[in-house]
Each structure stands twice: as structure tokens, then as C-alpha cells.
Amino acid sequence: MSGILLSNPVNAIPLMNRIRKIHFVGIGGTGMCGIAEILAHEGYCITGSDIVYSSTTRHLFELGVKIFIGHKYSNINNANVIVVSSAIHPNNPEILAAKQARIPVIKRAEMLSELMRFRHGIAISGTHGKTTTTTMIVNIYTAAGLDPTFINGGIVKSEGVHARLGYSRYLIVEADESDNSFLHLHPMVEVITNIDTDHIHEYQGNFEYLKKAFIDFLHNLPFYGYAIVCIDDPVICEILPKIKRKIITYGFNKNANLHIFNYRQHIEKSSFTVSRFNQTKLQVTLNAPGCHNALNATAAIAVATEEGISDKIILKTMLDFQGTHRRFENLGYYSLNKINDQTGEILLIDDYGHHPAELHATIVAIRTGWPDRRLVMVFQPHRYTRIKELYYDFIDVLSNVDILLILHVYSAGEPPILGADSQSLCHAIREFGKINPTFISNTKMLSGALFRLLRNNDLLLIQGAGTIGEVVRRLIVKND
């Protein structure tokens, strides 16, 4: 398990020594800021632009990264390469300026692949659960003293950052399938948590193209590498016969190489047993609720088992798991008298999930762990295309809460789509007949709705991938 790395692996690429200044367009994005941070720590001159200041841009600024707010031709001055987020339009002035100056413009995954080139890469992908699974693997490797470099899509709470430069050969990354760019990566180990209908517009509206992308990604493994996949997922089972690499399976399915059974949830903890081929069973206590997190944990256990990390370290890490920022994050109890002058308290949980399957998993975990609490959800839909593609799934799953407040769609740069807006979704849920949702048009209206609706013993769930977490935290947490 030796992980000693004696030199900077990027500088081991001779031509990369010619690259000194790297400019990121959309540097505040979760997929961008981690790569920028690692390169800054490796000694590169990093600059970046975004449309707003955020906690991530502030963090990078404190590391010495020059941040520009707004996109202008002059921002790319003297850059050797431009790294772009998938959310950036091709007509962005910085991209146009780079092309005119014949400066290379690359996707973030292409830069990530350069970071991985001389490292032992572990890439975690899948529609749901990849950020939490990445965090778990990072925690286990760190506890084992393997000092990995990591780049995650969310803040690893035990580390307080999205990314960290380690000095071993290990690089643990979240591999984003949303725009097909994960095919730039060539790791030694891959984890596929599941394959579901999301970002289909990026695959010409054809789910078969998304499945083909995962097949190609698995074949990016070298012949001596291996993949860890969840066979509870029917799409993964469908593509497995086409994969010509070593496969290790996990899941509640009895045929899995790592089989989960005896699952129990104890409020916000869970316990379960994992049987492993030719190895002792593990009795796991995980500091996170939900069957979905048991699956995430077992994927991490599979990686650690293959690496030869001791069971003692694995089990201790699961017991002490602190989680990931905004992934079923328990923010604690807040007094109602600071919100609406009533007596009592509410429990506040913040979750990034924005796909119907993720919402379903969160709702089930809450109903199991806190069955006597009224569930009040503040939901901010994310992307018009997602609402359009999964419209009826959203109607079904959102009808399973007690009180529902729906904010405007967080567009992530997309133009509006007729009938895929929050007002239309709200109307459709009301017509479905199980609950009567409220459309929230602004922060003042949200404050008033919370003042009017919250009562003692409620569980308030902040749900969505946009700005909703910061908005509700300001309204609730600042008053406590």
C-alpha cells in the first residue's frame, strides 16, 4: 500500500513545464474549483472568472488565485491554456479571445486527465451518489495514511474543502457524466453507482447514447484495472455483458460480490452486514441514514478491500463519517420563537438532490428516521431541461411530502422552456391531488410562508442544487 510520490506528477510531463498560467472560465463551479486549487498548490499561476462571487471564489482568492467577476476579453491576458466549464457558452468573450489568440481551450475533464496521467486514479461516476461515495473513499484512504490527492463535487466535511493536494500516488476524483467529458479520464479503478435518466439532452435525447458512454468509460480502464459496480441497478446489469474488464459487484442483490443484508436505520445512523467473497463479513455502523448511503458505503468498502486497507480502519471511518456539505446535512434544531414567535423547535436538513430518484431516497430516509415529524420541503428545481425530461416523476415524488414550497427554477444558464417552469410544476402537483403546493416567487414571500406554516416538531428540508441552501440558511440560521 505504499503511496510515496517523490515528484510533482504534472511536472513529470515535459511539455507541461511550458505551461505556467492557466485561466479557468466559470471557476466557481463545483467541477472547476477543485482542479484550480490543486494546480495552484502545484505552483501554477491560476486565474479565473465567474459571474458572481461565491464561497468557492472567495476560497480560491485566499489561496492567491486572481478572480475576475464578469467575462471579458482582457481576463485571459498571457494565459497559456483556457479551461472551460461545460456550462460556458461557446460565444463567451474569453473563449472567443482565446481562439483568436490561438490559445488552447480545453474542457475541465481534459485538465483532470493530465492530473491523473502519472497517478493511480480512482474515478467515481454514476447518476446518483458519486459525491458521497467519493467522500467515503477519501476518508478511508486518509485514515489509512495514504494521503491521497482528491477532487470532489462537494465539500468533504472532515477536510473542509472540495479538493486537496496529497503527496502519494493516489488521485481520487468524482467523474461527471453530464456532458460525456468523463471519457477523457483513464483511471486504474472506477466505481459506477448507477445509470439513470439525467442530462439526456446532452446525449441527443437518447438514453442509449448515455449507456454507451458508460460502456466506453469502463473500457478506459487498463486491462489490469477494475471496476466496482452496483448490480441493484438494472441498467448496469444490462450493460455488464458488454464489459471486457475485471468487474466487482455490490448491492442488496444476493448475487453481488459484496452483498448487503440486515439493513437497519436508527434515526440518522444505519447498520448493515456486508459479506465479501473469501473474506470475513463486516458489521457496519454508518453515520448516515438511508439504503442509498449503505450502497455508497459498500462501494467505498469494495475499493478499500481491494487496496488491502484493514477492516478496522474501514469500520472506524464509517462510524465516524462526517458526510459531505449539502448531502443530507443535518443542520440541527432551531427555535420557532426566532422564526414566527411560536414555542418549540424544528429540525433543519439541507440536501443537494435535484433528481426525482434522489428526492425519493431522501424522503424515504426522513420518513424512516423521523416518522412522527411533519415534512416541510422547500424545493428549488434545477434546470428547465431536467424538469421537462422528468416532469411526471417530479409530480409523483414531490407529492409525498406534507408541505411543499416551490421556488423559481435555477436555470444554470439554460433558457426557459414553456411548461417546464415552477408555476407549471406547482399547478400539476396540485391537480395530482395529494397536496396543495405553494409557488414562491421571491425571498420575502419565502420568509412569510415559513413564518405562517412552520410549527413545533416540523422537519424542514432544503432541497435543490442551486442557491436554495444559502437562501434558507440565511433565513433560518441567522435568526437563531
Curated annotation (Swiss-Prot):
Cell wall formation. It comes from Blochmanniella pennsylvanica (strain BPEN). Its EC number is 6.3.2.8. One of its GO terms (biological process) is cell wall organization. Pathway: Cell wall biogenesis; peptidoglycan biosynthesis. ATP binds at residues 126-132. GO terms for cellular component: cytoplasm. GO terms for molecular function: ATP binding; UDP-N-acetylmuramate-L-alanine ligase activity. InterPro entries: Mur-like_cat_sf, Mur_ligase_C, Mur_ligase_C_dom_sf, Mur_ligase_cen, Mur_ligase_N, MurCDEF_pg_biosynth, UDP-N-AcMur_Ala_ligase_MurC. HAMAP family: MurC (MF_00046). It is found in: Cytoplasm. It catalyses: UDP-N-acetyl-alpha-D-muramate + L-alanine + ATP = UDP-N-acetyl-alpha-D-muramoyl-L-alanine + ADP + phosphate + H(+). It holds the Pfam family Mur_ligase. This is UDP-N-acetylmuramate--L-alanine ligase. Disulfide bonds: none annotated. Keywords: ATP-binding, Cell cycle, Cell division, Cell shape, Cell wall biogenesis/degradation, Cytoplasm, Ligase, Nucleotide-binding, Peptidoglycan synthesis. Belongs to the MurCDEF family.
